[in-house]
Amino acid sequence: MGSEMCIRDSGRVVAEAKAAVKEAIKPGATSAEMDALAEEVIRSNGAIPSFKGYKPTPSMPFPATICFSFNEELVHGIPGNRKIEEGDIVSVDFGAIVEGFHGDSAFTVGVGEISEEAQRLIDVTSQSLYEGIKKAVVGGRLTDISHAVQEYAEGCSFSVVREYVGHGIGRSLHEEPQVPNYGSPGRGPLLKSGMALALSLIHI
């Protein structure tokens, strides 16, 4: 199986797990239950969770299949027994490996009724992603993506969190190039056919 097909398949598995978890996020459920569900879907497709056992540092392997963050937690929360409540805003991030190639995705949802401002933040962040994707074209420059994300977010009176960036993805979960969510257009590596990028946006 070619590398492009493997990455597509890993993305398909991630999308299936994403849909299952999103549907299961309800008041009373725990983030640990969401973690177990994601792992079940991933493994039932013959894939391996990307995050479980991943070592950002040699001494600290990540213990779960998903990152699950509540409300003010920006990213990389570890699932546990905390129950999801009405009005929570939760973010889920995870990946899957197929034939040695990674897929990676994240989403944020409101649980039941949330404030108008919270929903607007979710909507603006989502649209910022699509603005960045529009600039991910062969012959463009990496920071064309960065600039589009920043311009849309700031035009809607939000800010990008600069400490967290997107990245290349393939045989490793995190590969070069890093993809910041800010900057001037027309800079950085030339975008070429076959590149795989994971855009990672956090707005406040």
Where are these regions (language model features)?
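Catalytic-core "active-site belt" of small-molecule-metabolizing enzymes
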Residues: 4, 12-27, 31, 40-47, ...
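Acidic/histidine-enriched ion/cofactor-binding microenvironments in catalytic or ligand-binding pockets
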Residues: 62, 67-101, 177-202
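Translation machinery proteins
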Residues: 41-75
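Short, small-residue-biased leader/transition segments that mark boundaries at the very start
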Residues: 1-6, 204
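Ser/Thr-glycine-rich phosphate-binding loops at phosphate-binding pockets of nucleotides
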Residues: 30, 201-204
